[in-house]
A protein has these predicted regions:
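Rossmann-fold dinucleotide-binding core
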Residues: 97-177
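Interdomain hinge/lid region at the active-site interface
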Residues: 214-278
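NAD(P)-dependent dehydrogenase/reductase Rossmann-like domain
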Residues: 271-291
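Active-site-proximal catalytic alpha-helix in oxidoreductases
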Residues: 132-139, 161, 165-197, 208-220, ...
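NAD(P)+-binding Rossmann beta1-loop-alpha1 motif at the extreme N-terminus of oxidoreductases
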Residues: 1-67, 127, 161-162
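Rossmann-fold NAD(P) dinucleotide-binding segment
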Residues: 54-116
């Protein structure tokens, strides 16, 4: 008999789907739910129990992963599932929903299921590393009470870092995403300048490779730019949401660069790039896109 905890995954988008897949590969019993029922059907052949409602998905779960689009969706679903959860279950909120929404979710769970444990656990990484279990889990909350979640995190990640009380890891995730967003804007602008001056993205990477600026992320995004394939690893709309969450926590006037990027990316989203990978901002910057 397996000693692994039973897991429910709520939200089977790019990240939730990867989590469920890796859990199944590691022998976990996994139930899943998604607003769009077709998501996750491919995992049923590998053992996923797909449910029509989130309440059904969590009924037997000892560890619940929530990976929903934003704070509003997270709070809505949490209110629905809490009465249906096992009293001692561990609720792992793994989306980037911001600090006020995290505090609301903690209070809501405490009100509806006071014996449950809330673990705040956003991740560093996007779709491709998630599929390879190479993300980093940024966890916060009562680690002792949340011990049953640790083998779950181990199955979906390269490791877990703990940051004290629940909510602290939301803060760290927004710090990391502010850096990522700023980096992506720099990559896109540098690639545009290179193009104007007659260089390809591959030539730009060759000049960077081996030096201090040659981060693997830069290579991945320059490859996307070179191929003009912007299949979302992280949707521009989601990155824009995270930029705004980061700005909401910053001291006034301390992040003028990110403020400008958020304004630009809103224009890109309005121009039809919201569902593309955030690297599609390169394409939006092209003079031809504004012709």
């Amino acid at each position: 008999m397996s000693t692994l905890p039973k897991v429910a995954v709520l939200g089977l988008g790019a990240m939730g789907h990867a989590f469920a897949s890796n859990l199944l590969k590691n022998g976990f019993t996994v139930a899943g739910w998604n607003r769009s029922p077709a998501r996750g059907e491919d995992l049923q052949a590998h053992g996923l129990s797909l449910h029509a409602t989130p309440q059904q998905a969590v009924a037997d779960a000892e560890v619940i992963i929530s990976m929903l689009a934003d704070g509003e969706a997270t709070l809505e679903v949490l209110a629905q599932i809490a009465p249906a959860c096992q009293p001692q279950a561990i609720y792992c909120q793994m989306g980037t929903i911001g600090l006020p929404e995290t505090r609301q979710a903690i209070a809501l769970l405490r009100e509806l299921q006071p014996a449950m444990t809330y673990i705040d656990a956003p991740v560093s990484g996007t779709k491709a590393p998630a599929e390879k279990a190479q993300i980093l889990v940024l966890a916060s909350g009562d680690r002792e009470k949340g011990a049953a979640a640790e083998p779950v995190f181990a199955a979906i990640s390269r490791g877990t870092q703990w940051f004290g009380e629940a909510g602290n890891s939301q803060k760290m995730k927004l710090v990391l995403n502010a850096r990522l967003i700023s980096m992506m804007q720099g990559i896109a602008e540098s690639a545009q300048l290179a193009k104007t001056l007659g260089f390809t993205p591959d030539q730009l990477w060759s000049a960077l490779e081996g030096g201090p600026l040659a981060a693997p992320y830069v290579k991945v995004k320059l490859d996307a730019i070179a191929s003009e394939q912007f299949t979302p690893q992280m949707q521009l709309a989601h990155a824009l949401k995270d930029a705004r969450l980061a700005l909401s926590l910053a001291e006034p006037h301390t992040m003028p660069g990110l403020e400008t990027i958020a304004e630009l990316w809103q224009q890109a989203a309005d121009a039809g790039y919201a569902g593309e990978d955030l690297s599609a901002v390169y394409q939006w910057l092209s003079p031809s896109s504004k012709a």
